[in-house]
């Protein structure tokens, strides 16, 4: 696919979980009530998942798609070191997906992911309270034509 996109591994999950962006950590723990490492390992085993590298070899994040088109992504601060490379590779990953519909929800406070989702061509559908803390989440989707 790309020299920066690789099949996800448990080792990559450990590296991402240990250096998540603060907003991603907060979304997983406060928004979903999950442990980030556990969520990433589940993602490795239960979805078609990858990890993203940037030119200096750092892992910038992991992403995957579950059956039914539920897409997810968690990132590290390495996305800020090579923002154009990361955004281009994320777009390459999303554009290569064959699902007719990609969808999920995002914590309204996670401005970095909302900006990235917009860049990747996702549309925002509705806002609603979600999770153990009833935080504001936004449903998003992308329909392939």
Regions found by a protein language model. Give the residues of each.
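Conserved beta-hairpin
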Residues: 46-61
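Short amphipathic alpha-helix that is part of the acyltransferase structural core
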Residues: 1-34
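Conserved acyl-CoA
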Residues: 88-102, 111, 120
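A conserved beta-strand-loop-helix scaffold within acyl/acetyltransferase catalytic domains
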Residues: 63-69
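Active-site rim helix/loop that mediates acceptor-substrate recognition in acyltransferases
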Residues: 28-47
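Conserved beta-strand-loop-alpha-helix junction that forms the acyl-donor binding cleft
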Residues: 103-118, 123, 129-133
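A short, internal acetyl-CoA/4′-phosphopantetheine-binding micro-motif in the GNAT/acyltransferase core
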Residues: 72-88
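C-terminal "cap" of GNAT-fold acetyltransferases
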Residues: 130-145
